[in-house]
From Swiss-Prot:
Compartment list: Nucleus
Species for this entry: Lupinus polyphyllus
Position of the signal peptide: none
Gene that produces this protein: PPLZ02
Disulfide bonds: none
Record flagged with keyword Calcium: no
Protein name per UniProt: Protein PPLZ02
Lineage per the UniProt record: Eukaryota, Viridiplantae, Streptophyta, Embryophyta, Tracheophyta
Record key words, sorted: DNA-binding, Nucleus, Transcription, Transcription regulation
GO cellular component: nucleus
Length: 164
């Protein structure tokens, strides 16, 4: 027998009647628990708030977002710790997706043996590091170009990993 279709996304009902909400992040492959709620609507609203914090404005939610509505009703569904955790996930996913969308730029590393013409030492080193290097080398720094590549492997989600 098939499961009854849920009205909202991001939650389920326990066999004793309470409702639980969790959110999964497809890029980070993480699952974050929002908690246990008395009603399906509260669980769905907690999911929506978490989705907006984790995915930004592109999040798929149960209810339309109203920026003029008071935040007190939704913010009481999520703890401050959970909000911070969701924000960290959002920032981590931005960092993971940003390098793949931008062309790779070579990084320049100081080296006493290799020179790149037209680049001064002042432009490439932070002030404290620059002072240290000038003391060690007497102010004569050379540079070498190094191309840094970042490749990450992602496995596609299997059907049994995706919550419907």
């Amino acid at each position: 027998m098939a499961r009854p279709q849920q009205r909202y996304r991001g939650f389920r009902q326990r066999h004793w009647g309470s409702w639980v909400s969790e959110i999964r992040h497809s890029i980070l492959k993480t699952r974050i628990w929002q908690g246990t709620f008395e009603s399906a609507e509260d669980a769905a609203r907690a999911y929506d708030e978490a989705a907006r914090l984790m995915c930004g404005t592109r999040a798929r939610t149960n209810f339309p977002y109203n920026p003029n509505a008071s935040q007190s009703s939704s913010s009481k569904l999520l703890s401050a710790t959970l909000i911070a955790k969701l924000h960290r996930c959002y920032m981590a996913s931005l960092q993971m997706t940003r390098p793949s969308s931008l062309p790779e730029a070579p990084r320049i590393i100081a080296s006493p043996n290799n020179a790149v013409k037209g680049i001064g030492a002042d432009a490439m080193l932070l002030p404290k590091k620059r002072e240290q290097e000038e003391q060690e080398t007497g102010g004569n720094l050379d540079f070498k170009k190094v191309k840094v590549e970042c490749s990450q492997q992602f496995k596609p989600l299997e059907e049994d990993h995706i919550a419907q």
